[in-house]
Amino acid sequence: MKTIEGFKLRKLGNEYILVGESMALINFNKMITLNETAAFLWKEAEKGSFDAASLCKALCDEYDVAPEKAMTDVVATIDSWKEAGVIE
């Protein structure tokens, strides 16, 4: 998988949002907000092609989290990104 080009992560106060930076990507009816963990995963995903296993490893390396819990969170995050249309 990979992120769709044109979506940028922005921090507003204590929250993170994904912003479509071209008119084709802007949907004024939907804002994609991310928590700190999902923002970390997005930054990892932006580095290139990724899968659940690679994001899980990055999450475990960065945070003190059990691999099983990390994989559950990563899969849920990827599913939400697919639903939002920000990855392919």
Q: PLM features: residue spans?
A:
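Acidic, low-complexity/disordered tracts enriched in E/D and polar residues
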Residues: 1-40
